[in-house]
Amino acid sequence: MTRRIGILTSGGDCPGLNAAIRGVARAAYAMFDAEIVGIQDGYRGLIEGEWREMRRDEFSGILTLGGTILGTSRQPFRTMRVIGEDNVDKVKSMKKNYERMKLDCLVTLGGNGTHKTANLLSEEGLNVVSLPKTIDNDIWLTDVTFGFHTAVDIATDVIDRLHTTAASHGRTMVVEIMGNKAGWLTLYAGLAGGADIILLPEIPYDIDRVCEAVARRANAGKAFSILAVAEGAMDREEAAMKKKQRAEARAAMPYASVSHRIAAQIEQKIGVETRVVVPGHIQRGGSPSAYDRVLSTRFGVHAAQLIRDGVYGMAVGMHGHDVVHNPLREVAGKTKFVPQDHQIVQAARQMGICMGD
């Protein structure tokens, strides 16, 4: 029996998307009679009916390719049940186009928002399997997401390269690393890159403690310091605020970001020349690492196995060294934060790295 599989990629792009698409398709072709439908630009394509029949040869040569051959877009979950000015019922449209494409199932590749919408569609009666994609590594019930380790490699390389210029000029360097809610990327890259100070959203910092750490290194004859700062890092005052109040305070501050504020405060408080480096979207671009190619492929193959067995409403993930699946309803709407007592946090502290608190 032929199974028609719709595939979409949603949210921010990251390395490994094409490898995962390839994994789903090639495993499906090998295990059963499959037809693959490529849905363009994420959930927007499912809403607007933008899709195309995929040929087998389109899945060749994409294992190492960054980005996504299907395109992507951000369609916030909070708007999915909201009928806007265009008078479009998004959920109704997605269900209608699912039927119009004659799909047997839908495979979604994305982060937390993607999983929430995937769960919504599952609850609406569609057959859905979701794969965990994000450089933030913050999806619930999976030890790792594809794209994360490639981003760690990139951010680590940035920190590595800053060591030489920081040492040459005797400067303190603040590296702003992606991660608005969860600090996994900053934690891993900071430790791998030999950062002296690591600031995460989960551990509110005290700027005086940060300055003390920089001054202590200077007094010990260290000509420079490296700070790995998550874009969502916050000080203790901000941490005590409500979410809306904190957002308003951030919008009103005279700095481009929290990293720029920290750099200015270091210069003002202890007179140490400080520069900010923001690698930005470089962290989510380019070819996936060997690790992410293998991980993405394994996730894709597992999705095909679930489709073969008729098991839907599932989110694929990793537990230890094993690829597993969990009910979407248990994954959607939850975020995997860095625990303050995590072994890697403890290791950083025991090495004398300042965590800002």
Task: Please give the residue ranges for each predicted region.
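Accessory alpha-helical/coil subdomains and C-terminal extensions
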Residues: 97, 108-110, 118-120, 127, ...
